[in-house]
UniProtKB/Swiss-Prot annotation:
Protein name: U14-theraphotoxin-Cg1a 3
Location relative to the cell: Secreted
Disulphide bond pairs: 50-64, 57-69, 63-75
Signal peptide extent: 1-21
Any one Gene Ontology molecular-function term assigned to this protein's record: toxin activity
Function field: Probable ion channel inhibitor.
Tissue-level expression: Expressed by the venom gland.
Entry's free-text remark on domains: The presence of a 'disulfide through disulfide knot' structurally defines this protein as a knottin.
Record carries keyword Secreted: yes
Amino acid sequence: MKTSVLLVILGIAAITVQCTASESVEQDSLRTFVDTVLGWNAEMASEARCGGWMAKCADSDDCCETFHCTRFNVCGK
């Protein structure tokens, strides 16, 4: 009787650990997907700010390099 109760408790603990581990993997996959989408949106916003290759961005310290606004670049030099 005691052995069967112990086995049931160990089985429940093993299932709980396995389910928790699989949830972590699913959450990591979702987080990676969301980060990718948000990064892509930020990239699109940066491209929208650029007027073209090596054009000035809104901030005079920024300029477009490959259609992305980047800091610490001097446009045309």
